[in-house]
C-alpha cells in the first residue's frame, strides 16, 4: 500500500489502483479532486482543517460511486446521498474496495474547558496505517505506521511522547503540522523520535510525497 501525504491532516492511501482519502480539509486545495478520484473518503471529525464540506460535496456529485464515512455530524452536513454517506463510531468495521477499515475512539481532545468537545474517530486501514484525527487515540492493536499529530491548539509534546510509546508503531509520520515551521517540524521529529524520548523514527513527509507502508 502506498501513502501520499498532503497538507496538514490529509493523506491518500493507494492499493491495487484504488485510492482512499482521509481528512480532506480546507488546507488541502486539491481535496475535491482527490476525493472525486477515490473509492472512499474517511473523515475523523467536522473541523474545517479535516473536513472541507464543499470539496466533499462536489466529489459526491462528480462520482456517484464515492462513499463517505465519519461521525454523525458529517452526515448532518452532507446529507445521506442515498446511503453513500453514513456515520461510523468506535467498534465499527467495514470494507470498501481493497481497503479494510476499523474505527476507534469517541471524542476530540480537549482544547479548552470553554470549548465543547465533539465526536472524533480514528481509522486503522488494512491493519497497517492509523490516523487518529485530533486525539491521542490508542487503538490497542498492532500499528505499522502511525500518523502522528504534532501541532495544534490541543496537542501536547509530553502527551505525544507517551502516545507514541503507548501505540508502539513500527514507524511514524508527522501530520497536523501546518502550524510548525520547517525548523519546528524537525525539532518535533527529533524530540518524539529515538534521538529524543520516542521509541521509533518520526518521518517528515513533504506534501505530495509518497512512501510504501
Region annotations inferred by a language model:
Residues 1-36, 87-142, 154-159, 205-213:
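Core dinuclear metal-dependent hydrolase active-site scaffold
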Residues 4, 79-93, 97, 161, ...:
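Binuclear metal-ion centers of metallo-dependent hydrolases, dominated by the metallo-beta-lactamase
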Residues 27-70, 144-147:
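Active-site metal-binding motif and surrounding structural segment of the metallo-beta-lactamase
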Residues 42, 69, 86, 102, ...:
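Hydrophobic/aromatic beta-strand patches that form the interior of the parallel beta-sheet core
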Residues 47-48, 73-75, 92, 137, ...:
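Alpha-helix capping/helix-boundary segments
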Residues 62-66, 167-171, 198-200:
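A short helix->loop->beta-strand "cap" motif at the edges of active sites that frequently abuts
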Residues 64-73, 171-178:
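Short internal beta-strands
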Residues 121-185, 189, 194:
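Metallo-beta-lactamase
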Amino acid at each position: 500500500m502506498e501513502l501520499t501525504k498532503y497538507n496538514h491532516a490529509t493523506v491518500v492511501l493507494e492499493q491495487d489502483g484504488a485510492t482512499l482519502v482521509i481528512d480532506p480539509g480546507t488546507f488541502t486545495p486539491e481535496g475535491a479532486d482527490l476525493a472525486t478520484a477515490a473509492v472512499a473518503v474517511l473523515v475523523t471529525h467536522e473541523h474545517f482543517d479535516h473536513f472541507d464540506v464543499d470539496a466533499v460535496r462536489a466529489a459526491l456529485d462528480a462520482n456517484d460511486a464515492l462513499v463517505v464515512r465519519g461521525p454523525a455530524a458529517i452526515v448532518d452536513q452532507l446529507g445521506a446521498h442515498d446511503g453513500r454517506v453514513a456515520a461510523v463510531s468506535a467498534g465499527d468495521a467495514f470494507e470498501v474496495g481493497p481497503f479494510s477499515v476499523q474505527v476507534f475512539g469517541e471524542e476530540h481532545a480537549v482544547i479548552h474547558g470553554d470549548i465543547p468537545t465533539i465526536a472524533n474517530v480514528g481509522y486503522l486501514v488494512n491493519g497497517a496505517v492509523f490516523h487518529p484525527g485530533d486525539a491521542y487515540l490508542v487503538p490497542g492493536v498492532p500499528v505499522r505506521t502511525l500518523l502522528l499529530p504534532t501541532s495544534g491548539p490541543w496537542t501536547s509534546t509530553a502527551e505525544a511522547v507517551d502516545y507514541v510509546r503507548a501505540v508502539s508503531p513500527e514507524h511514524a509520520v508527522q501530520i497536523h503540522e501546518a502550524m510548525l515551521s520547517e525548523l519546528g517540524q524537525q525539532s518535533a521529529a527529533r524530540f518524539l523520535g529515538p534521538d529524543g524520548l520516542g521509541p521509533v523514527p518520526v518521518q517528515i513527509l513533504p506534501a505530495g510525497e509518497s512512501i510504501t507502508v
